[in-house]
Every structure is written in structure tokens, then in C-alpha cells.
From Swiss-Prot:
N-glycosylated; required for processing and activation. Activated through proteolytic processing by a trypsin-like protease; cleaved into a N-terminal propeptide and an activated corin protease fragment. Atrial natriuretic peptide-converting enzyme, 180 kDa soluble fragment is produced by cleavage by ADAM10. Cleavage by ADAM10 to produce soluble 180 kDa soluble fragment takes place after the transmembrane region and before FZ 1. Residues 334-371, 371-407, 407-444, 444-481, 645-681, 681-719, 720-756 form the LDL-receptor class A domain. Changing residue 968 to S: Prevents proteolytic processing and activation. It comes from the Eukaryota. The keyword Nuclease does not apply. This is Atrial natriuretic peptide-converting enzyme. The keyword Membrane applies. Its main location: membrane. Specifically expressed in heart. Also detected in kidney, aorta, brain and testis. In kidney, present in epithelial cells, with segmental expression in the proximal tubule, thick ascending limb, connecting tubule, and throughout the collecting duct (at protein level). Serine-type endopeptidase involved in atrial natriuretic peptide (NPPA) processing. Converts through proteolytic cleavage the non-functional propeptide NPPA into the active hormone, thereby regulating blood pressure in heart and promoting natriuresis, diuresis and vasodilation. Proteolytic cleavage of pro-NPPA also plays a role in female pregnancy by promoting trophoblast invasion and spiral artery remodeling in uterus. Also acts as a regulator of sodium reabsorption in kidney. May also process pro-NPPB the B-type natriuretic peptide. PANTHER family: ACROSIN-RELATED (PTHR24252), ATRIAL NATRIURETIC PEPTIDE-CONVERTING ENZYME ISOFORM X1 (PTHR24252:SF11). The active site is at residues 908, 957, 1050.
Amino acid sequence: MGRVSFNVRVSSVRRARCSCPGRCYLSCRVPPTTALHALNGFGRAGVLGETAGGTVGLGPSGTRGFLSGSKFQASGSLKDCFGAPPAPDVLRADSSVGEGCPQKLVTANLLRFLLLVLIPCICALIVLLAILLSFVGTLKKVYFKSNDSEPLVTDGEVRVPGVIHVNRYENTGAPSMPPSQSIPAWTPRAPSLEDQSHGNTSTCVNITHRQCQILPYHSTLAPLLPIVKNMDTEKFLKFFTYLHRLGCYQHILLFGCSLAFPKCIVDGDDRHGLLPCRSFCEAAKEGCESVLGMVNSSWPDSLRCSQFRYHTENNSDASRICFSLQQEHGKQSLCGGGESFLCTSGLCISKKLQCNGYNDCDDWSDEAHCNCSEDLFHCGTGKCLHHSLVCDGYDDCGDLSDEQNCDCNLTKEHRCGDGRCIAAEWVCDGDHDCVDKSDEVNCSCPSQGLVECRSGQCIPSTFQCDGDEDCKDGSDEENCSDRPTPCPGGDRGCLDSSCVESCAGSSLCDSDSSLSNCSHCEPITLELCMNLPYNLTHYPNYLGHRTQKEASISWESALFPALVQTNCYKYLMFFACTILVPKCDVNTGQRVPPCRLLCEHSKERCESVLGIVGLQWPEDTDCSQFPEQSSDNQTCLLPNEDVEECSPSHFKCRSGRCVLGSRRCDGQADCDDDSDEENCGCKERDLWECPLNKQCLKHTLICDGFPDCSDSMDEKNCSFCQDDELECANHECVPRDLWCDGWTDCSDSSDEWGCVTLSKNGNSSSFLTVHRSARDHHVCADGWQETLSQLACRQMGLGEPSVTELVQGQEGQQWLRLHSSWENLNGSTLQELLVHRRSCPSGSEISLLCTKQDCGRRPAARMNKRILGGRTSRPGRWPWQCSLQSEPSGHICGCVLIAKKWVLTVAHCFEGREDADVWKVVFGINNLDHPSGFMQTRFVKTILLHPRYSRAVVDYDISVVELSDDINETSYVRPVCLPSPREFLEPDTYCYITGWGHMGNKMPFKLQEGEVRIIPLEQCQSYFDMKTITNRMICAGYESGTVDSCMIDSGGPLVCERPGGQWTLFGLTSWGSVCFSKVLGPGVYSNVSYFVDWIERQIYIQTFLQKKSQG
């Protein structure tokens, strides 16, 4: 039980009990407005307001006590407490708090506040489970038949059966309401299920609900439990879905499904349904009640196990009395038949995933009873390995069982405490490769490739003189001769050697200046924080972001809006914005911090929300760095009571609740008053409607050159070109005669795309064809040379020409012939060297075959190798992996080599850093901090971001990078293959992700790899409320949380192996959960297949086309 603050006079403080079942605010001055109404038939709980004098008074409806009206509302909502307008929360210690202005509080007020916070609060700190359900945002409205009666209230208690109760305490400060004269049918006094007849003459129906396909039967009757009868099935099952994700009981979802869809039993003309057995209920209650206990709740009374029957009653057939786990029929039945496999963890997976060498169950139970052939090693996890992978220093089994009790060659290897042998070069390299960390004992900093602080602490060399004090004694920022003057006002953002966007247009900036000299204010452009009481900010912010662009794609910019809709703290969004876009003092040009009290309240009330889903409060938001509001020498920010709670990224319900904007008009009511699902037509929302699938588009997406409708109707009828003109991809018109002439006339260069192709006739010959003036022309062979064949093959993105033949052409063909002085034209494209002619003197045309460029090969990799769960990768296994680096920051993002001069990465890596001169790309390295003999470095020449990249939804997150020079292709540096356009991966395909990323709180020096399974987009969307999953994205991971995506950095590859050992790039690590988990879902990758045309087009334009000279 924690300490909380009150905003009432001491004389009026009473031992009040929270009225809203399931959750209380930290302040008991106002009962909670965000309580859990899951699975319970209760109405809208009112709130005890505060009178002007500070005493406990009437609720919003004027009713004294705990109900918001004299009559129980039958259409109670799962989100009623969530949806009610939050009462003013306690933050101020004085009435002078105001409008985001700097606050300086006097000692008397502070003493008053300290006195008040010592008063013990009777309410629970927070109902974590309620917040979790709200966090995912799926709590819906629930309807109950209450016979128009009120819930029974006696002795200061609201006796509402079926409620997930919090601890009850006597309320001596408010009169009790009179008992209700009629008792709702769903109270404990209502007839129990044992007394009710299950007979039914209705027809059995098939179970179609996707989640409940795990049931071992396929037909059901109408729900039997009163609570299920009067509640939408989807809403009922949400409660069990989240308990399932918390892993409290492996069959909790099965239990919920058996309640929602009771088994239909046919007995002659009679039909009756089977509810779960009492033992099943007791097992579910035993497993999950402890989770509910964490939030001061208990197993719902409406699901009390005493109402269910024993399977041994009357010594009759148990299968016709109640539904049990039926272990005697095998576990398979619990997952819906022979097509599924039931993991020990309770997860149901496709049977085809069993015994495939992958940890799909998260507990290896799908691999536990698999047989290995005699020539293979059987891992403790059940996996089968080639014996050459045993005792090689790499964890191939996933549990290190292949590396136990090995005979180490002590001249070349180090023996870990568990018997594992690792390479000698891994000793003192900065990574803990031994489980017991014995490989990093008694190591000097230089031996690990690190720099030693004065205190003896080791840090990477790139951390020196970077503006951040990484050494605890600050010695890494001393004697920095090339460092500019210190940042004013304690700013810790002297992170870049050149002025960034925040300094653009400032007279303080020049080519030699630094962020430390940029002290002016800039307008707030971060959408989340556009409704603040101030409109100027100063960077870097308090989370270390150097620009607003960087802040907009940060994890925190997604975290805080998601937390806002949990109602964990009224002023959370205000606090978030004060650290994301700090207020800029126009007089000093310095940041104005939030007050420490605001930070502490935000953290106290919302940190536990993150804890239940395995996340931590952002570590950079240490409240001790912010001043007390009573400080005499520094001002700080506190919010006004009427500060806007909803950010521009939220939709504000009529009730005042904030829901994510992405959930507006999504077909499911998230507002307690359903206002988010009103006026949802495209025209009503001023959007354009696709004719085929009725998809709504912003008008800015119409006729922009990128099809968005499934039938591309948004790009039709966009321009009206003359008969002698052709339409560019961006709907400009150019003269027909200029099409494919080697000079770009369309502003998007589309008049020069795909001009050279190979076409087949009846035989096997491939004829060279040029699409001039919108007509295909054959190329006359007169004067042809091999260098022209090479140019043609390169222009089509192929390898060297293998065959060039002169073949007799046909009568009536359209001909192009070489320009008489083509050798002097210095042309970069084939079409530029050709001119239109009516005939070809020889009558021969060019037949050409080009080789395919070799890609996706790994000559240095050891084959037959699988690594799970994020293990260190062997050198040479991923020769296309590269590191995108900048000075002085070092490694920033991963990248992928796709051609000798071209790499791919994600667009958001360049947010605020789009100058190619500050970047370089490093190839052929496994350990970032140790140079390799295979390493190659190239500077960046050109950065091409996708024009439709949106940082708001991180869509179209891809960029093409041109290198200054070609790489030298070796066994350790080679390009990966690109997929065919629109070649999509099937669900349950296994692929690899690689990168350096982060593991825990440190970045590993060695390249990491892990296997992930492709997850359907519709399933993926269910994990993400803040973002919309589009077909430009791929979802991959494990629902069970096997692979840790913390290890993978942005821009790293997702590659899949084709038959024959060739690897193809299908994804680039873009965004997703901070780490894979049951609650947070998979990682999201840019779908390379969708962008292949665009990628090849950019390479073609940069390589071959030249802009038509003006004038």
C-alpha cells in the first residue's frame, strides 16, 4: 500500500471506500473513473466529488454515495469507469497552479502537501489488470438484464454479484443507500445453474469464432450463463484473452470458450449444453486468482465454481454431465483435433510446426518427443543437430546442451565454468559469452577494445567527447580539444558535429558550429504535443532526442499516447510533452523542465502499467533531474487543471475519455458512449472512398502516383493528355516523341522507366526491344558491338551478356538503329544511342541472353546450422549485413548490401540526419569494436528516402543508399537477392533476422541472429493499437516470445532461404515491440517485396539517367 496525496482539508478527511469496483486512483479524494467492469453486471458507478470547500460531496449526478443515479442503469459498460470524465487529479499544492507556467511554491504550501500525503489511503494503488485491458483498448460495452432494479447496497457496501471486487473497507463518512427491493437475476440469489434446466429444443450451430477453434467440439447452443447471455461474446472473451497472454493458466482461454460456447449434446429430440466441470473452473481459478490478487481483486463471483457440476455426479457418463480437459482422450483434443498441437505452455500451434527444429511453443514441448537419426546429436530441447556443431562454441541447441562437458583446446579456446569452450579471441572482448561470465574476468579495457575511464570503468571509444558523460566520473568528456563550447543551461545534447534541423536558419549556425551553439527556440511540430499551453521548444529534449523528427519516431512517442487511454494519470500527456518537446524560454533560449512532483506522480501512477506487460519506465526520465517546485533559483512546469488530456493523436469521446485516433471508426466501440463509431462514412469524414472495397483515403493520396485502392482507381482519370502526349506516373503530360529517348522529361523520370526489355517470339530467342514513343521497336543489328550488349544487360539489372546473336527479323517491324556517331555521344542509356528508322539494311535484329547476377550465397558460412533465441553469429554467415555509421556516434542502424554499390536500410534511420557526407557503411565485420581482416568501408554518396515515408505510422519505411565506390565482392562481403515484385511469404515460414541492436541495457559487440516465424497481418494487427499494419509491412516473431527483438537494430535484414541455398531479402527491421512477448506481439518489418519496383527504379535512375539540360 503506497502513500498518496489528498486535496481536501484535514478536518474533512474520512475513511472512504472506493466505489468503482476493480480500481482506485492513488488519491481517494475521488474514486476511480477507470475501473474494470469486465465480466460483471454492474452499472455506471458514480464518483464522490469534492465540494468547493474541499469536503467529500456529491457525485456528478448529484447522488450522495456511490451510485450515479437513483436507478441502476441496465446498459452498464465494461468501460463505464474508464469512460467517465476523469475528476481533477491531485497535483497542486496551491491554487495558483496554472496553465503550464513555471511554478514556485512557498514552504508553507509544501509543508501542507507533505502533511497530507502521510494520510493513509484505503484504496488500492492501481488495478494493473484493469489498466492492461484498457491499455490494449478492447474493453467494450456490456449489457445485463437487471429487471430495472438497483444493485443491493447494505452496510456501506455495494453488493454487486459478479463484480471483480477490490478489498472492502467500512465507510463511515457517507450514508448507505437503502436496500433494493428487487434483486437482479444475475445476483448470487438468482437460481444457480444446478437449478436450471439445460434442455433446449433449438438447433446446434457450428462454432465460427476464430479464438475458440481450440475447443475439441464444433457445435454449440445458446450461452447458458446469464452473464454470457447478456454480453457480447467478443467482449466476454476479452477478459480470458488477456489472462491467457499473462500466462496465469495454460487453459484459461479454453475455459472461457467453453463458457461462451457450451458443447451441444443431442439426446433424441432434446438439445442441451455442457458447461465446464467444477474441477476445470477450480484449476482456472487457482491459476489466475493470484494474478487478480496482485490488483486487489478476486475471481469474479459470477464465475464462482460452486455453480458448476462435478464430472462424477450420479456415476453416469462424465462426458454428458460437464466439459473437462478430457486428458483421457489425449491433449490433441484441446486444440480442436488432429490439425493442432497443444504445447505444455497451453499454446495451440499448427501440427505441422511440431518436430521441425524450431521452438514454436516457447518451452520446446513441440520438439520434446522427436526422434533423431543415429548420425545426429539429440539436444536437451529435443532438437537434432549434426555432430560437427557439437562443442564448437556456439549454442546451436538453444539450451547449450551441445556445449556441455567439452574437451577444450586451451591454446585456442577458453573453458567456461559449465564446460563450454569458446574461441580465445572471445575472451576479454566486452561480451559475456560464458554463462558464468568467466571470459570477461580480470580484463583490461584496452584488451576489450574499450577506453578506460579514470575510475576504471570501460566504455567504447566512440563515447569519448560525444557530449554525454558515460564515465561515472565524467572523464570521457575531459580534454576534448575539438569539442565546441559547452551547451548552455546544462543541455546534454552536444551530440553532433554539424548543425541539425533545429538550427536551420539560425545566424548562430555555420558549417563549423555545433548543437552546443544552437540556443534559439523552434516551433513545436510534434503532432502529439500540438495542443500544449506553449508553442516553442528547444532541443535536445530530456530523452536525448536531438530533433523533433527523432522524437516522433522514438519508442516514447508511441508509449505515452498508449498509456494515456489507460487513464492511469490525468496529466500524463502533459508530462510526456514537457520531456518530448520541452518548453523554450524565449528570453534565455533554454529549456524549462517539468517539476519533479509532476514526474513523480506520472511515474508512480503509470509505471506499474508497464511492469505488467514486461516494460520499464523510460530510464532517461529520472525525476531527480527535475527541480522541486519550491526551488528559488529555477522554474519548472506544472499543468493547469483544465489542461487538455487528449493529444491530437487521440479521439476525444463525448464523455471526455481519450481513445487512440487509429481506433476511430474501426467497427468496434471504444468510447463508452460509442461516439468513436459515429459519422464514419468517407464523405462524412471528408475522405475519398475507393469504389471496390470502400476504403477511405485522404485527398492528398489521390492522384499522387502511388496506387492505394486495390484496383488503383485512386490513380485513374487524374490527367487529360493530348493525343500526341503520354501521361507520366505522376500524371504530368509529355510529348509522345520524347518517351524513352534517354532524357528525362517527366519530373519523376517515368518516361525513361523500363524502356529496354527482352521479348520472346515463337522460338527460344529473346529479342532486344526498346519501347520508344509508346510502341515496341526492334533493334537493328547493323554496327552492333559487345559493349552495347553489356550496357543493355546492365540497364535491365542483369549480369553480363552470355549470348549475343544476329537473327533475321520479320517484315513490317518497327526499327531503331544506332546513331551514326553513337560512340561519340557518351550516352548512359541504350535508348539514347538509337534513332528511329523505317528499315534495317541487313534485316537482322539483336537476340540477347543475360546472366543473372549472383546473389544470396554464403561461401564462408558453415551450413546445416540453426540458432534460436538470439545467439552470436559466426563470421561470414551473413555477408550482406552491414553497419550504417556516423561520426562521432558510430553504429546507428543495420543495413543490407543488395548490389556492389547499393544498400538498403529503413528511412527512419536518417531522421534529422539526411546529409550523406556524415555517413559511412562498414561491411565484413562481426564484432563492432574489433576490426576484421575482411572489413570494407565505403562512404555514402546518395540517400534516397521513399517519398511516402510517414513517421506518424512508420509506413513506407525504406531507403536506398548509394555508396561512393563499389565493394570488392568476397566470401565475407556479398549481396543478398531481392524478391520478385509482390512475392509474399506464406504464414509460418521461418526466416532469420540479424543485427547488433540491444540486449538488455547494453549493445552487443558481436553480430546477433535469430529465427522468426512469419505471422499473418490480421493477427499481427491485434497486437498494436497505436499503429496500423499495412501491406507494406511484414510481421514476424513468435506469439510465445521466443526471440528477443531487443537484439535487432533498425534496418537489419529479414532473410529467407530458397531451395538451393540462396538467400532472399524480404524485410527490413522497422518497428514493433521493444522485445517480443506474449503481450507485446511480434516485430514489424518493411516489406521489401512491395518496394522492389521502386528500389530498382531508383538504382536505374541514379545509374543511367541524366536530367535534360534546361534551355
